[in-house]
Amino acid sequence: MDSKKIKTLGELKKSGYISKSIKQEIRENLIKRIQAKENPFPGILGYEDSVIPDTERALLSKHNILFLGLRGQAKTRMARQMIDLLDEYIPIVAGSEINDDPLQPISRYAIDLIAEQGDKTPIAWLHRSQRYGEKLATPDVSVADLIGDIDPIKAANLKLSFADERVLHYGIIPRSNRSIFVINELPDLQARIQVSLFNILEEGDLQIRGFKLRLPLDVLFVFTANPEDYTNRGSIVTPLKDRIESQILTHYPKTLETALEITEQEADISEAQQEKVKVSDLIKRLIEQVAFEARGSELVDKKSGVSARLTISAYENAISAAERRAIINEEKETQVWLSDLIGIIPSITGKIELVYEGEQEGPYLVAFNLLERSIRTQFGQYFPNPDTLKKKKSKEAAPEENPYKAITRWFDAGNTLNNYFETKDEDKVQLLYKVDGLHALVKKHFKSASDKENALLMEFVLHGLAAHSLISKKVMEGKIEFKDLMGSMLNIGSAHFSEEDFNEEDFN
């Protein structure tokens, strides 16, 4: 059907156009997508066997949907992508505020216009991009905002009484007729406002200010909410929850590989940054592991969750930290070093909610310790786990069997390595080669690694040994200091720092 050629109701009737509800429309288009083996929600990763099938079943059942999950779980994005399941264009009565179907008008305006002009009633065509409404639920949202109210100014201008239906000012829901309407953070909506949605969900109609009118609206409702309202702002009233046919539980990425894909897809990295800064797979995994460590930490509020935005923001900050260093040192290109990861601390502190014990430790210390735990966890994936070496009895494990003996002995001899944040790449590499046994260890386990990869892995070994308490590590102003444990008894384990050790300027 060429919608551009159809301008009147008569032409629409002759074309054989058949009205259908938005839920039927989405159902039919979804069936076509499934038959064509197309993903109706492209770009949504990690939900292929859970949330997406649940959503497809709900849409095939013509249900309203509640996405229930912690922050940063793509709930709103799922709703927005439903726009692509709508027909490209639908006809409406020209000038209608609520997108009246020309064949099934419901507003006084459309009914009167069709009664007056008949088949000559003008038709407009509405693109699917205009058939999506979204409202963030806040405590100040009123019934008038959502449903509508009497407009005294309109009544005065048109010289109509308040008993006349034409004095109504429609809210955002009636204006979303024949559209998808999303209410984000549903628990934030006051209980009395939630009650006003009962009729729309159950009967498909609404009443405004006691008017005896019935508007059988055609709307697909999608709601988003947290499973527990961790801010104590409110909750979803039970009768409303009962009227939402499908409740779908979202979740965080279950594997590191999925999380890596999401971060790379969502991170906003410019072409100039991509050319100047190279990021190894090791750095990417360390950043992702921080989120997994945070979700399992006793110091982080599990009711709040740890958003995927944490790793996206951290990834961007890590690249920017390396870029800034390269600009300062006038280097044409560089790579992200582990020392650059100190720059992701602000991304962590701003994305986690701490429990009481975490607040006592302080956000910077908790964030730093999460990074340390990430290094500790990933270290065992690349090199022999020092913990297993510690557990061996001395008679079973000769000193030469410890692959880290030469490195720790170098530090035991009183040597110190100062890894400055703004050191040039070549100077950092020369510094790392001074540590006995460090290059040999990396070469043994990564024979085909490039020179840059070797240098990064050498730095990783130092951080990994510090995370396992084989050497000490202390973050100081402008640098990270590595030395032997006996010489740093006050900083055993490298993860125990006072809040005073962190200066706001160190993270900028």
Question: What residue ranges belong to the model's regions?
Answer:
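Conserved ASCE/P-loop NTPase catalytic core
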Residues: 2-257, 268-285, 298-302, 383-508
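Elongated, mostly alpha-helical coiled-coil "stalk/stator" tethers of large membrane protein machines
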Residues: 358-372, 376, 380-383, 390-391, ...
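Short alpha-helical scaffolding segments that buttress acidic/His motifs in well-ordered protein cores
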Residues: 263, 287-291
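Generic structural signal for hydrophobic core residues of well-folded globular domains
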Residues: 34, 150, 294, 322-325, ...
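Amphipathic alpha-helical interface segments used for dimerization/assembly
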Residues: 59, 82-86, 90, 201, ...
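C-terminal helical "lid" subdomain and adjoining coupling/linker elements of P-loop NTPases
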Residues: 273-280, 293-370, 382
